[in-house]
Amino acid sequence: MRYLNTKNIIAAGVLRSCMNSIAWGAIIPDRTRIIMNESDKGEALKLTNQSKKLPYLAQTWIEDTKGNKSRDFIVTVPPMVRLNPNEQIQIRMITQEKIAQLPKDRETLFYFNVREIPPKTDKKNVMQVTMQHALKLFWRPKAIELEDDGVMTYEKVEIIRRNDGSIRFNNKMPYHVTLGYIGTNGVTMLPQTQSLMVLPFSHADTQFKNVPSTFQVGYINDFGGLSFYEINCPTVNNSCNVSVAKRDK
């Protein structure tokens, strides 16, 4: 059991965001990403109403990577719940029979959505904003589960610096790899609040160029923190040298 972005939509009074880009409203979860192991048969997440005065409704559901609501593989229980001021409630994620149809050799990505609904107001000319957030939910089959005390390592991600200074990440692992930092001296080159996700057994390129031959990357780990690596690329279009950085937070 382990304790994940870029959807920002303002429409019909709904603000949808990710954990990294816009602060949560009254309702907050106990983590920023969700890992569901097949052997656990399910997972639980706690929601807390931070408001000291107002009750809120919290609506939860699962979406696939195309933004379609799905109850075929995982469902949330309860799908709607009331949280009184300062109250904490547990939401369960339960697998369905069709979960057996998912690939056994790699992770499958879903999104856990939570929408907070404030109480109605009697005041006139007041627009209420409903906060909606999506957390990455990674379904991890038994064949690739980590031990309880296991820590993900990222040496199998091949890094190549190309002629124009852009970086290619070849993910040779069965896990989704998300980069939350690419840069030097603590200054990231990633656009503000954005990350770069590489699908299992796939690759992704940076949109920015002119990356120096020596830099650092920070992978977002299972716990939502960053695991840092030192990257040294003595030549272009060849694999760079990768070593664990001294810091890991």
Predicted regions and their residues:
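Beta-sheet-dominated interaction scaffolds and their linkers
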Residues: 24-48, 147-161
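Bacterial N-terminal signal peptides that target proteins for export
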Residues: 1-11
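Intrinsically disordered, low-complexity Pro/Gly/Ser/Thr-rich segments with frequent PxxP/GP/PP motifs
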Residues: 71-100, 188-214
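Terminal connector regions
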Residues: 98-144, 214-249
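Short acidic, flexible loop segments centered on an aromatic residue
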Residues: 52-68, 172-189
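N-terminal targeting signals for Sec/Tat export/insertion, comprising classic cleavable signal peptides
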Residues: 32-70
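Bacterial N-terminal signal peptides
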Residues: 12-20
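Buried hydrophobic-core signal for structured, non-transmembrane domains
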Residues: 43-49, 93, 110-115, 165-171
